[in-house]
Amino acid sequence: MSKKYVYLFSEGNATMRELLGGKGANLAEMTKIIGADVVPQGFTITTEACTQYYEDGRRINDDIQAQINEYIVKMEEITGKKFGDKENPLLVSVRSGARASMPGMMDTILNLGLNEEVVNTMAAKSGNPRWAWDCYRRFIQMYSDVVMEVGKKYFEELIDKMKEEKGVTQDVELTADDLKVLANQFKAEYKAKIGEEFPSDPKVQLMGAIQAVFRSWDNPRANVYRRDNDIPYSWGTAVNVQSMAFGNMGDDCGTGVAFTRDPATGEKKLMGEFLTNAQGEDVVAGVRTPMPIAQMKEKFPAAYDKFTEICSRLENHYRDMQDMEFTVENQKLYMLQTRNGKRTAQAALKIACDLVDEGMISEKEAVAMIDPRNLDTLLHPQFDQKALKAATPVGKALPASPGAACGKVVFTAEDAKEWGAKGEKVILVRLETSPEDIEGMKAAQGILTVRGGMTSHAAVVARGMGTCCVSGCSEINMDEENKKFVLSGKTYVEGDYISLDGSTGNIYDGVIPTVDASIGGEFGRIMAWADKYRTLKVRTNADTPADAIRARELGAEGIGLCRTEHMFFEADRIAAIREMICSDTVEQREKALAKLEPMQQGDFEALYEAMEGYGVTIRFLDPPLHEFVPTEEKDIELLANTQGKTVEEIKAIIASLHEFNPMMGHRGCRLAVTYPEIAAMQTRAVIKAAINVSKKLGTKIVPEIMIPLVGEVKELAYVKKVVCETADKVIAEAGSDLKYQVGTMIEIPRAALTADEIAKEAEFFSFGTNDLTQMTFGFSRDDAGKFLDAYYDRKIYENDPFAKIDQIGVGKLVKMAAELGRSARPDIKLGICGEHGGDPSSVEFCHKVGLTYVSCSPFRVPIARLAAAQASIKDNK
């Protein structure tokens, strides 16, 4: 028997998400909860059919086609309508639905099944020709765009031209005759672009639409969204074929989107929007600015009462805030979909805490339901209140996604991306955004749209990304072609500064200063619960007391990486390090290093004080020496004068430091082997600082000295001997009983492979996954960006291995080294200090392999704390 690729809504349930996708599983579950009379019925083509489509060379095979045709017949029996029948036609929508919600990422087709014959009969039988022709022109436009990839703009231009000729401003003001003319113009446009007639056979239309949904799983914007949200390519998408409910039959019809709680603030109140005489995509696409959901009560009282009752039932059933789409057809309510709603980080925390307080979920469930990556947005700036009070808004629209943003105006996603890459802060200003704009939206500080509401594409995507967004500013007079707009009498051109307040919807001229965000009470509650359930410690990467203090405020339990070279770049210090580099003898080098020692000691004391007894891992000098030498002629001359050498001699020294591959050159422990006096100086500074701060604070400090880039145990043994002899001497001279540890970074594959040998010398390992990734893959982090996009396009890599740990290769080395290290030294401390320490999927991996801690940048500490708790909760299920 062949595999089952198609399921009626009545055959599925919420547990079948992997097979039916999120939308399909929820439609099946919703059918069970609220009944088939409220949920327009249909069937779901599974994610396995999508995978099969790609395996068969992007073709729907005969078996899957036969099952689809069989289920069309079943759908006809359920609805009493017939596909392609002009007397009683079955019209359907075709939508994608992956396992994870991907709003706006994939394409929807409405009114499929229409052709000229069916439309004429519908127009006559319904007595509503305007509705019939509106459905048809929409279908031609969507099918042409989504299935045949004829750009939307050609059709929009024809609509705008027609409105201009008729002297109207809204699509709804066009008559049945106008829409009939448009439909024929659309078909002519289709033929001109494609070279064949628009398909009239509904089964041909349906297969084309299903293929388009499968194909859209691999479109560029879907690939970008998947990479950003950890959604594997292998999952595929399901396709939902659902009988149509019509919100565009007249003024007793409408369509809307609603949330059971406010997705921007988390407040417990129904929030949403609807449009009368419209179809589903109109609300989300932002073509007309809709009415608040409360006004639906006056228009459709019975449907509104039923809707609020269903909202309550759905939220109680799913135990989470729901995002629902609905249609009212001749005063009767139809529910088209429900899903857990996208929300801002602040709303996510409030909703989670409120659901715990309402007895709906447990603390563990609250911790598990928050996306750790979204916490980042809470820690980002808001407008300075004083400056904000003094500023007068030049416009106001809908506060679609909170936060403060100021930057230069740009008008296209391409410009936003290009300017952003140069380090410019930009505000993307659009009539409305579409999924094609996703990369520009990512690059922008804020987004401002002329059309669209709180549930438009711009609003939903911006909230998901944590980007400030103000939508539906109809006061703007936009001239996209010439890249300018007029607001409150002022013309703004590309490059002019504006500021947006995503919490109020206010728009300001110029730049308003921002201040650091303050964190609310819900953040503290969620973090306290996270700390209760996690076993993995979280440290920070910090080189300055300010970073260390910030990280402690955000819950860091120590410093996992202090890069000492970052302390060498201040004017007085760089002079001393350059003197050391230019020295000819050990004595000269020691003299130069003696100038650096008290400065380093002071730095370490400040870090120890900030950390109040928590562990501090200090990495000894790592980068190659050429990074410290001057490149400008005037600086070279200055160095020659201070060193009593000629410019030529200095240039010769600089030239001698040149390496063909500095990443694998004279750096890390190799510097300490060549110049042990550097390691000795840094050891003295570390130990003296620890002794002083231990006395001052009355706390026990155990310095952790980390030797970088070890690949051979004998290297470590050599440098460790220098460190221990120096440290023991300083401790003895001070009459102290200070204890210290010497460990190493595991960042060379050979170190991972011989970790049992290295653990005999090292009291702790810290995995430097940035270098370990470079050396395992054999490509440079600084150059990989030039070719990684091609690798993503060709499905060689799904993610940037420098952003998410490569669990199959690099991860195997980490796991092996951890096991080997523990076999030789059971109490060895294991950490990770690469950028991966703040990535949730990498944190989960670190939990699984039994590391002691992860270390990440200060602002990512809360992300790591929450991700560690989620990993632990998942592990104990």
Where are these regions (language model features)?
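Conserved alpha/beta-domain cores
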Residues: R95, I519, W529-K877
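Nucleotide/phosphate-binding sheet-loop regions of phosphoryl- and nucleotidyl-transfer enzymes
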Residues: M1-A391, E418, E424-I427, S434-E439, ...
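Glycine-rich phosphate/ribose-binding loops and adjacent secondary-structure elements
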Residues: Q331-Y334, L431-K442, G446, M454-V460, ...
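Structural motif
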Residues: N240, V410, I427-V429, L448, ...
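Hydrophobic beta-strand scaffold residues
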Residues: V38-V39, C469, L830
